[in-house]
């Protein structure tokens, strides 16, 4: 089963200070996220309230943040407030589409021990992430993305929740 996931939006983060800046803002170790790897992270208030959860993908020359589409503008606006002298550029990527793929017989797979990072295949216009719960997330331009199927999107969302990976929206 494959489907577009219109729930997600993508933000590109570039500039020579991108990893160190995000390392200081997000909950995961972005400085040590290797090229071709992805990780889950959250963006929190100083008191620890989660504002957004996301996937961070290191493509080498930039980082991609995949989060709820409804939150992308507000989170980017808030992150920009803290840039100061850091060499970081945030760019909303409306031309990129997120798709999900699950095997028809995929069972929820709650993590016994959380993975700090997981592999991401990076090709010219596509990033494919092997998620810890047996699903695959694909970030691509629209012509390379799966068609939208409401039933498949519902199955994807249910699979993520049952696997312990809900999304904040």
What are the residue ranges of the model-derived segments?
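Basic, glycine/lysine-rich polyanion-binding surfaces/domains
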Residues: 1-169
């Amino acid at each position: 089963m494959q489907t577009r996931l219109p729930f997600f939006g993508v933000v590109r983060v570039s500039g020579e200070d991108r990893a160190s800046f995000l390392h200081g803002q997000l909950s995961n170790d972005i400085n040590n996220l290797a090229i071709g790897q992805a990780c889950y992270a959250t963006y929190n208030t100083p008191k620890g309230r989660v504002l957004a959860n996301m996937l961070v993908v290191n493509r080498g020359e930039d980082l991609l943040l995949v989060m709820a589409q409804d939150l992308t503008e507000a989170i980017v606006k808030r992150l920009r407030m803290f840039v100061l002298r850091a060499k970081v550029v945030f760019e909303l990527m409306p031309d990129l589409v997120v798709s999900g793929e699950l095997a028809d017989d995929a069972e929820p797979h709650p993590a016994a021990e959380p993975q700090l990072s997981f592999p991401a295949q990076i090709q010219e216009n596509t990033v494919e992430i092997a998620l810890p719960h047996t699903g695959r997330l694909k970030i691509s331009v629209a012509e390379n993305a799966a068609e939208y199927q409401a039933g498949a999107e519902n199955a994807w969302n249910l699979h993520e929740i049952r696997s312990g990976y809900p999304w904040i929206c």
